[in-house]
Amino acid sequence: MPTVISASVAPRTGAEPMSPGPIAQAAQDKGTEAGGGNPSGIYSAIISRNFPIIGVKEKTFEQLHKKCLEKKVLFVDPEFPPDETSLFYSQKFPIQFVWKRPPEICENPRFIVGGANRTDICQGDLGDCWFLAAIACLTLNKRLLFRVIPHDQSFTENYAGIFHFQFWRYGDWVDVVIDDCLPTYNNQLVFTKSNHRNEFWNALLEKAYAKLHGSYEALKGGNTTEAMEDFTGGVTEFFEIKDAPRDMYKIMKKAIERGSLMGCSIDDGTNMTYGTSPSGLKMGELIERMVRNMDNSRLRDSDLIPEGCSDDRPTRMIVPVQFETRMACGLVKGHAYSVTGLEEALYKGEKVKLVRLRNPWGQVEWNGSWSDSWKDWSYVDKDEKARLQHQVTEDGEFWMSYDDFIYHFTKLEICNLTADALESDKLQTWTVSVNEGRWVRGCSAGGCRNFPDTFWTNPQYRLKLLEEDDDPDDSEVICSFLVALMQKNRRKDRKLGANLFTIGFAIYEVPKEMHGNKQHLQKDFFLYNASKARSRTYINMREVSERFRLPPSEYVIVPSTYEPHQEGEFILRVFSEKRNLSEEVENTISVDRPVKKKKNKPIIFVSDRANSNKELGVDQETEEGKDNTSPDKQAKSPQLEPGNTDQESEEQRQFRNIFRQIAGDDMEICADELKNVLNRVVNKHKDLKTQGFTLESCRSMIALMDTDGSGRLNLQEFHHLWKKIKTWQKIFKHYDTDQSGTINSYEMRNAVKDAGFHLNNQLYDIITMRYADKYMNIDFDSFICCFVRLEGMFRAFNAFDKDGDGIIKLNVLEWLQLTMYA
């Protein structure tokens, strides 16, 4: 019986380290040995042939910057233009924003004023507090900050209106280039701004992140860990504070010491991501509130800067339009906070554990014990105050006791820069393997274990845990590892209607007799074997990760969406303390009853398609158990050769007579005649419920069975085709269990295997895309056409693979003849 897997809304964990150590280095390999780990390995032939349609390679920041300086022009980004298309996609904005460059907004604009720090960040009206909370955490780690935000940029030296930032994207670091045009209203920045009016690094960083996801609106609502991962490539872990371990404070302390990024939040009871408006609030209402907010914050005339004075005063701020729920204690539900420090302070002779948090609004703070204006600060020693940097200022940052923290907050997210367990006192070197894959509707999007008929079709990844942990205090022979599953590009595709899928994974132990066997595990295996481990829940967040401890062995990881038929891409990473091997399960591509090759005899290129099809006779003789001694003799079947009737059986004689009636005296049939004879036969099989073969299908059959390049089929060729169709018809009926005249595309895997073809996951995906209808069903005509093409292409490859090394070399004429006549 399938186990019930809960589906819930919860933040996710996991990602890959960015530091140039062993983890980052290993990640560069991306599991290329598996065949499915390299992103170019997914339908690479199809993607490559269509690449010229997409366009040329983008120019780098350095090239664009140099070009602008040479031409003495300011850069305008054509990919993310300063207009409404870069702002919102769900509806048109009712008022006109003015896009301005920083020198047009204020005098003496600066990229960074006095160093980038957490107090620079003030949230605008976008609802991206999750992103800004992550920026505040990022400023605490200067090494990471300098990677994301190259500091050699300014509005004076070599200024050309162009800036760039770097983000981690699914295993790679990408450089995002933007112009410095920013949306303004009443000469004020609409979205993120700095505490200093003439500082713009954070507004430009937000714009680069918006470009990465397609628009500013795409940033509305999210989880802090998502941005943390994109800033670091780190591994994120998620804690429900009510279920947190007793030493949670120790875990948080070590996270701070190791440069990890931390965020927290308070559930608002709606299961919404941070900064997301209530479901009833439409984009139009958000826009109206934004306009009211901006009108209310318009500068007074007396606030104008006298001519010639520097415009580096603090920004005038108001609380932005928010939909989170503010509590009496000053905290806000459904809102993201940054954890910026942990300390212990002496208070009335006792040590008190403290947590420092920051609200990305830049104001609205905790008003309880240890808040800025707490009356009992007078009982705290002066030196302690200095150490805690206590000051009464409305900057959004505040202290609170750890006890109050765990009482009020419900979620804690920690983005680690390595996969070291924070409970451990020592740092280890972890190894990582990275695989990229996709769920394809109708083929490899099988859903979770609750759907046993399709679960087995999901991508599968073999995990070999080869060595146990080095832990002298642990008597168990155990391997520690972390699995992180991340779905790709869902935020960017929001404007196309995409939402985050509910995802998770299960881990099964592979039986010893199947170790080293890379075959895709079948349905029966999962029906009769329970998982050894799995993600705690399926969640509709970008990533889910989990730590496990299992004995050394061989396992299979099955990542999936909760519901079947949901199509998308993902990245699966496995971190372990010791050496491991994680690779996608890929069947060896082959066909049963391999055709014997003609040794030392080159193909004469009258029609290489026809020459490759001369192996038909060999295949036929092999099936009939005949002696295959002479390739030339095998090329024709003597029993069905015109004029040779002495050895024919009664059945063969009847077959010849029927064929003569159709073909006439020349004993050859064209595509129209083939269509008539095949449809005359299949129409008698009412259970197939087919409308018959199309003319195009019959043309393909002739091309793939033609041995002499005549464009017609003789008796022998037709006999071979007919035998194949009868065999494939039996397979089709076997899988057409409901007698609908179609088979489910998920069952095509087994049907292809029963026909003697062994393919990998990519080819199964391609078959589904090519032959299934919109309901993911394959009718009899498409079924036969698929098998005819498979047989013909295997046979053609075999004929051209003269030395049997699995590689063929064709010139352009050979390639076009082979593919056009198919």
Curated annotation (Swiss-Prot):
Predominant location of this chain?
Answer: cytoplasm
Task: Locate the residues binding Ca(2+) 3.
Answer: D736, D738, S740, T742, E747
Q: Which reaction does it catalyse?
A: Broad endopeptidase activity
Subunit relationships: Homodimer; via EF-hand domain 4. Interacts with TTN/titin. Interacts with CMYA5; this interaction, which results in CMYA5 proteolysis, may protect CAPN3 from autolysis. Interacts with SIMC1. Interacts with UTP25; the interaction is required for CAPN3 translocation to the nucleolus.
Give the matching InterPro entries.
C2_III, Calpain_cysteine_protease, Calpain_domain_III, Calpain_III, Calpain_III_sf, CAPN3/13-like_C_EFh, CAPN3_PEF, EF-hand-dom_pair
Region feature (Domain IV):
651-822
Q: Which domain of life is it from?
A: Eukaryota
Q: Where is this region: Linker?
A: 588-650
So what does this one do?
Answer: Calcium-regulated non-lysosomal thiol-protease. Proteolytically cleaves CTBP1. Mediates, with UTP25, the proteasome-independent degradation of p53/TP53.
> For the region Domain III, what residue ranges are annotated?
419-587
Domain EF-hand: where? 650-684, 693-726, 723-758, 788-822
The protein's name is Calpain-3
**Which subcellular locations apply to this protein?**
Cytoplasm; Nucleus, Nucleolus
Q: Which residues are listed for Ca(2+) 4 binding in this entry?
A: D801, D803, D805, I807
Q: Where is the Calpain catalytic domain?
A: 74-418
Q: How is its activity regulated?
A: Activated by micromolar concentrations of calcium and inhibited by calpastatin.
Q: Which UniProt keywords apply?
A: Calcium, Cytoplasm, Hydrolase, Metal-binding, Nucleus, Protease, Repeat, Thiol protease
Residues annotated as region Disordered? 1-36, 604-652
Q: Which Pfam families match?
A: Calpain_III, Calpain_u2, CAPN13-like_C_EFh, EF-hand_8, Peptidase_C2
